[in-house]
């Protein structure tokens, strides 16, 4: 029987961020971890002949610096929800969950996770845009920030940054069932917590390691109780046999 290492048993750290405060904070939270210094994250993340399926069972963590910008204009086919200045941000690449249908499997050559620790530079890049116009920004498109919040603290920092900039609205999308954050973080009506939900059978079959749908719905209630606006996302829409029956298989949150 194949035995995998635990998640983040190996952490690759760019030499340029080895002394960065966020790098140190993240490493302090990891136990029994092998730390390997590298010159550039692409030396590991973009190397040839990686097995994404194998890596999904034992993800490595890569701590790096983004030097080319992280704020991108949203594509017309993506969900802007009527916002004119729609952007998305990649402060992390890849996800700790392993949904079979996820576009990230075809977007990245690796199943490992990259965290750009220089969040202050991303904020500076965004502030330059905010000086010109109001922005609607999706900050959790290429990763699930909520699911890894205990390690990075990025959700807390994004909320604090958004509260300081009245012409910024952000969406944080997740499949995590964490409820504790929303009573501990100060709410902001311009921080939308968006939960992707699926029928239980679909989630169990295809959304590996993600929280169960009812756990996500309960977390959405916790976010609402904490004062955050909440969005439920039925995405992607995938045809399934007996799909009409699946619509009624989840119990009510009130049960």
Task: Indicate where each model-derived feature is located.
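Flexible, acidic/Gly-rich N-terminal and inter-domain linker regions that tether
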Residues: 1-85
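Conserved Radical SAM active-site core
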Residues: 62-85, 100-196
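Glycine-rich S-adenosyl-L-methionine
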Residues: 210-222
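Conserved small/polar residues in nucleotide/adenosyl-binding loops
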Residues: 248-255
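A short acidic (Asp/Glu
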Residues: 21-24, 148-151, 181-185, 205-207, ...
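Aromatic/hydrophobic pocket-lining residues that form the small-molecule binding cavity
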Residues: 122, 216, 246-247
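Conserved strand-turn element in the central/C-terminal portion of the radical SAM core barrel
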Residues: 202, 209, 224-243
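Cysteine-centered iron-sulfur cluster-binding motifs in ferredoxin-type domains/subunits
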Residues: 89-99
């Amino acid at each position: 029987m194949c035995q995998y290492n635990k998640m983040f048993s190996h952490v690759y750290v760019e030499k340029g961020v080895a002394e960065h405060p966020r790098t140190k904070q993240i490493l302090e939270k990891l136990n029994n971890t092998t730390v390997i210094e590298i010159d550039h994250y692409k030396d590991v993340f973009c190397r040839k002949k990686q097995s994404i399926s194998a890596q999904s069972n034992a993800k490595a963590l890569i701590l790096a610096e983004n030097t080319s910008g992280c704020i991108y204009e949203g594509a017309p086919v993506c969900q802007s929800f009527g916002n004119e200045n729609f952007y998305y941000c990649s402060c992390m690449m890849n996800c700790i969950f392993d949904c079979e249908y996820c576009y990230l499997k075809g977007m990245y050559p690796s199943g490992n996770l990259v965290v750009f620790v220089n969040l202050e530079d991303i904020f500076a890049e965004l502030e330059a845009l905010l000086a010109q116009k109001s922005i609607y920004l999706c900050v959790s498109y290429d990763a699930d920030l909520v699911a890894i919040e205990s390690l990075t603290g990025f959700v807390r920092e994004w909320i604090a940054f958004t509260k300081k900039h009245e012409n910024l609205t952000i969406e944080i999308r997740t499949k995590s069932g964490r409820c504790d954050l929303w009573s501990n973080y100060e709410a902001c009506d311009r921080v939308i917590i968006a939960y992707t939900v699926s029928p239980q059978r679909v989630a169990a079959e295809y959304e590996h390691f993600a929280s169960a749908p009812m756990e996500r719905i309960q977390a959405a209630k916790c976010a609402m109780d904490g004062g955050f606006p909440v969005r439920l996302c039925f995405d992607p829409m995938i045809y399934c046999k007996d799909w009409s029956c699946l619509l009624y298989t989840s119990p009510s949150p009130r049960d």
